[in-house]
Amino acid sequence: MAHLWLATGNRKKRAEMERLLGGMRLPDGTPLTLHTVDELGEPFEVAETEPDFRGNARLKAAALAQLTGAVALADDSGLSVDALHGRPGVLSARYGGPGLDDRGRLVRLLQELEQVPDGKRTARFTCSICLCGPDGTVRLAVEEHCEGLMLRAPQGAGGFGYDPAFVALEHAAAVPPRTFADLDPATKDTVSHRGKAMRRLLAALQADSSLLRA
């Protein structure tokens, strides 16, 4: 049996990762067993001090791999808005300070975009994934993006974070445009940054199962 630890305490992000990885088997039929930080019995927190998504994903994956003595996977992702010079970027999960929840961060972002015309509201989600071996060395790193636009008000009941105001370019022509929060999980996975990155990860693991060797 192959084991993989997921280095995230974000339950909604973790649910997406588990959905995309769930049921995976290696070429020899070996099932992949996923483990979460909840199993540690203690808080797992890593200071995200790197200036980019790749660096922060590496920090988290290496820390959990060394802590567990197993292979660990980390995802660092966020939203970059062109009119805000790339903000919130690596601060996406902490934008506006610790007093704000997901909804509060989204409201703040949309307030900052109030004067930005519709044609200038371009943005992209980025997902960087890093796989580290038990000694903390990087075994695989992938990064993917989803280009889109920011609406003026949130819509949709699904997703999390900035999903209710982000429309992927693939769904921008719909009337009305469909945000990530409007999409069912399977449809979102086909175009999202995380869906693209996880498919690349899965392909790599299927091609080389030694990446999961403890």
Stretches found by the model and what they are:
Residues 2-5, 11-35, 39-214:
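Anionic-ligand binding patches
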